[in-house]
């Protein structure tokens, strides 16, 4: 058969333990979570890269709903001049 795996070299043989990735929780959900506000520059800077881009939610573990709120707050803050568009 063309797709049968052989135990020989290059077969990718050994039994490897699966890597367990812990599920991250959203930092904006919960009882003591901070509110997303366009005036809170210190909070918003944590979700901007060193080049000034918005960090994706798969890295920051922010939920989809809160990521939309966060990006809107960052864009509003940029428009008002509280945050830079580009960091050189």
UniProtKB/Swiss-Prot annotation:
Keyword annotations = Ribonucleoprotein, Ribosomal protein, RNA-binding, rRNA-binding
Regarding protein family, the annotation reads: Belongs to the bacterial ribosomal protein bS18 family.
Subunit structure as annotated in this protein's UniProt entry: Part of the 30S ribosomal subunit. Forms a tight heterodimer with protein bS6.
- One matching Pfam family: Ribosomal_S18
Checking NCBIfam families in the record gives:
S18 (TIGR00165)
Report the gene name.
rpsR
What is the role of the protein in this entry? Binds as a heterodimer with protein bS6 to the central domain of the 16S rRNA, where it helps stabilize the platform of the 30S subunit.
Q: Which BP terms from GO are recorded?
A: translation
**GO MF terms held by the record:** small ribosomal subunit rRNA binding; structural constituent of ribosome
Question: This protein is called what?
Answer: Small ribosomal subunit protein bS18
Which superkingdom is the protein from?
Answer: Bacteria
Q: Which Gene Ontology cellular component annotation is one that this UniProt entry carries?
A: cytosolic small ribosomal subunit
Enumerate the residue ranges of region (Disordered). Answer: 1-26
Which HAMAP family does this UniProt record tie to the protein?
Ribosomal_bS18
UniProt xrefs under InterPro entries: Ribosomal_bS18, Ribosomal_bS18_CS, Ribosomal_bS18_sf
